Structures are given as structure tokens and as C-alpha cells.
Regions:
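N-terminal, membrane-interfacial amphipathic/helix-forming hydrophobic leader that caps
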Residues: 1-111, 253-266
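Membrane-water interface of transmembrane alpha-helices
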Residues: 55-69, 132-147
Length: 266
């Protein structure tokens, strides 16, 4: 989940947290321009691809991490967090759509329809695999003495209205994150670092993007991102990962909630 800062907080962060957030933000700015220059000059990508990849691989994950000091230990307004994330995700997804489909249309970002039976089988299979990752991480976390972050627990929907908006957030995340980090980024990066390298790089960034879930959550979403990347490449279509990602978020966030999260007592 990505979003803003002050509108999400019931209590403001302290000065040390703001300084740390500013430092991380400046790091993101520097990394963004470094990636743009490298991709546009020595590599020779078109400027719009260089800028968009720099946003996906540097700016978005680093700026997401910059939010963490601001929201550590404060009360979150969940609805504001959901809506700001929805807007951010749709902007990101729309940018990837326009840039990624400019030459070859929707097929360039993997939006290729499968026959009904393969579509259902791939979507269900990836959903089950993703849920299995979540379930298996509970005993792993217990063995390692880890637990899910307080922030992740706090962001889970509680009321009917929150569950409704969280469902919209799940759709936005499933569509936009898959379009950005699988459908757009992997095909653009594959000629530069190979398909495997592109899948690994985008999977690592995808995990870091979920830093609000804590170290355990970063690893878990990274593994899940790897599963979805494999599903995209193996099926030849982005639709199964989009459907699976959306269903996983709905199941984990609304249906099962905290019962799937790891704690030291579990």
C-alpha cells in the first residue's frame, strides 16, 4: 500500500521521525535521477521508459519506506490510507498502461486473454499458491521468532465501510501493481538483464514496496511476487496474476484478517 503522510495520521510524528523521513526522501530523489540517467544514456532506453522505470524501481519503494518513520507509533485513519493508496495505485497503473501500450497495444503488457478453462485454472492455482505462502510463513515466523508489524495489523479493515473500501483497494492493487511490476517492467527490463533477472529485480522491489508490513512482510510479499511473476511468464498472460493478486488481498484482508498474521505467540 502506498499513500500520503499527514492526512493519514491522527497524531503527528516527532521531529526525529520527520528528519529521518526527509533523509530517506532525498535518497529516493537521488536514486531516481541516477536510474534515469543510466537507463537513458548508456542503456539507451526512450526517456519515458527511463523515467517510468526509475519511478517504479527507485522512487516508489524508497518514498514508501520514507513514510514509515512518520506513521510509526501513531494512530492511522484507515479510510484515508485506503483512499490515498487507491489514487496512487491508479495513477501508477494508468502511467504504465499509456507508456507500455504505446507501440504494440495491450499485448505489450501481457493483457492477453486466455481460453476460459486455462484462465480459471491459472487464476485459482496462483491464488492458492499465494495463500499457501501466507500460511507457511506463520510457522516459519514462529520458528524464527518474528511477527507481523503493528502497522499491518492496524491497517486491516474493521468496519463494514472499511471492508468495502478495502475491497476497492484490493482491485486497485491487483490491477495496478501487476500491470506495473509484471506487465510493464519485466518486458522492458528483459532485453537488458534477461527475463530471469527482470523477474528477480521486480520481485525484490515489490517486496520492499510493502515495507509497512515489516521485515517478515517484505520477505513474504517478495516470495508471493515471485510466484505471480512466474505465473505471468508461464501462462503468457497478465490476467491470472491480476485476478489472483486481487483475490489474495480480499481473502487475506477481509475474509481471514489477523488469523493469517504471524505473532510470537502463534
Amino acid at each position: 500500500m502506498t499513500g500520503g503522510n499527514d492526512p493519514l495520521l491522527a497524531d503527528g510524528p516527532g521531529a526525529p521521525a520527520r528528519r529521518l523521513a526527509r533523509g530517506i526522501t532525498w535518497l529516493g530523489v537521488v536514486l531516481f535521477w541516477v536510474v534515469v540517467v543510466i537507463l537513458a544514456r548508456p542503456v539507451g532506453l526512450p526517456l519515458y521508459d527511463a523515467i517510468l522505470l526509475a519511478v517504479l524501481l527507485a522512487a516508489v519503494p524508497v518514498f514508501s519506506m520514507a513514510q514509515l518513520p512518520l506513521i510509526d507509533g501513531v494512530q492511522i485513519d484507515r479510510l484515508s490510507a485506503y483512499w490515498s493508496s487507491i489514487v496512487t495505485l491508479w495513477i501508477l497503473g494508468t502511467a504504465c498502461w499509456f507508456v507500455g501500450t504505446r507501440d504494440m497495444g495491450a499485448t505489450a503488457v501481457g493483457l492477453v486473454w486466455l481460453a476460459p478453462v486455462p484462465l480459471v485454472l491459472w487464476s485459482v492455482g496462483l491464488t492458492l499458491a499465494g495463500m499457501l505462502v501466507i500460511v507457511l510463513f506463520r510457522p516459519i515466523a514462529s520458528w524464527a521468532g518474528g511477527e507481523d508489524s503493528r502497522l499491518l495489523r492496524q491497517l486491516l479493515p474493521r468496519t463494514r465501510r472499511e471492508r468495502q473500501v478495502f475491497a476497492l483497494l484490493s482491485v486497485a492493487a491487483g490491477g495496478s501493481e501487476e500491470l506495473a511490476y509484471r506487465g510493464y517492467a519485466i518486458p522492458v527490463l528483459a532485453p537488458l538483464i534477461g527475463t530471469f533477472g527482470a523477474a528477480v529485480l521486480t520481485t525484490v522491489v515489490f517486496g520492499i514496496l510493502h515495507g509497512y508490513q515489516g521485515r517478515l512482510g517484505i520477505l513474504r510479499t517478495g516470495v508471493m511476487g515471485g510466484v505471480l511473476a512466474w505465473g505471468f511468464l508461464a501462462s503468457g498472460s497478465l490476467w491470472p496474476p491480476i485476478i489472483a493478486h486481487t483475490l489474495i488481498d480480499l481473502l487475506a484482508g477481509i475474509v481471514f484478517g489477523e488469523r493469517l498474521l504471524a505473532s510470537r505467540e502463534s
